[in-house]
């Protein structure tokens, strides 16, 4: 099964580099040189091998092997990028999850009160932060003191909110 790992938002320069907004985890592995990515453009699957990767202003800057000119890549702006979900170089440790398993999960507090659903995840360096959409939008740190249970199979998460977290 493949998962969406990003979207091409623009080009950069004239040598075929693209700007990718990632919506995936493990980007250090998924976007490393030599990895094969599938770009879906006009319902066609186009496979590209990553030639280079760097991060600039929160976006992933990629070049693909065989693409050396902006004209060869510009038409792909807005296209989604996919990769196989179960990547051979990614080993999940205990309490690690694929973003695609967490996004969409219903979130409840430890009293079983519904809070909302996970709509996005972003990395802060220290820990991931889950964006929960309910009556309001909440930012929930993925730390053991807050997230008590993750049931991927039933798409359910239990948290113990620290004081002020849901205000």
UniProtKB/Swiss-Prot annotation:
Q: Where in the cell is it found?
A: Cytoplasm
Indicate where this protein is primarily found: cytoplasm
State whether keyword rRNA processing applies: yes
PRC barrel domain: from which residue to which, for each copy?
94-165
- Membrane spanning segments where? none
In terms of Gene3D superfamilies, this protein maps to: PRC-barrel domain, RimM
Keywords from UniProt, A to Z, are: Chaperone, Cytoplasm, Ribosome biogenesis, rRNA processing
Q: Which GO terms describe its molecular function?
A: ribosome binding
Q: Name one Pfam family in it.
A: RimM
Q: Name one GO biological process term.
A: maturation of SSU-rRNA
> Can you name a GO cellular component term?
ribosome
Q: What is known of its domains?
A: The PRC barrel domain binds ribosomal protein uS19.
Query: Could you tell me what this protein does?
Result: An accessory protein needed during the final step in the assembly of 30S ribosomal subunit, possibly for assembly of the head region. Essential for efficient processing of 16S rRNA. May be needed both before and after RbfA during the maturation of 16S rRNA. It has affinity for free ribosomal 30S subunits but not for 70S ribosomes.
Q: Which family does it belong to?
A: Belongs to the RimM family.
Quote the protein name from its UniProt record: Ribosome maturation factor RimM
Origin organism is Staphylococcus aureus (strain NCTC 8325 / PS 47)
């Amino acid at each position: 099964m493949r998962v969406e790992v990003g979207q091409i938002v623009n080009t950069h320069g004239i040598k075929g580099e693209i700007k990718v907004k990632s919506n995936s985890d493990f980007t250090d592995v998924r976007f490393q040189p030599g990895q094969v990515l599938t770009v879906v453009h006009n319902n066609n699957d186009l496979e590209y091998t990553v030639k280079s990767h760097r991060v600039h202003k929160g976006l992933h800057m990629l070049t693909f092997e065989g693409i050396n000119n902006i004209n060869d890549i510009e038409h792909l702006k807005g296209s989604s990028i996919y990769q196989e979900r179960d990547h051979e170089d990614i080993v999940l440790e205990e309490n690690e999850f694929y973003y695609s398993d967490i996004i969409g999960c219903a979130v409840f507090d430890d009293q079983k009160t519904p809070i909302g659903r996970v709509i996005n995840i972003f990395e802060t360096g220290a820990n991931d932060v889950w964006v929960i959409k309910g009556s309001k939008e909440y930012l929930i740190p993925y730390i053991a003191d807050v997230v008590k249970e993750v049931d991927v199979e039933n798409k359910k998460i239990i948290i113990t909110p620290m004081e002020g977290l849901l205000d």
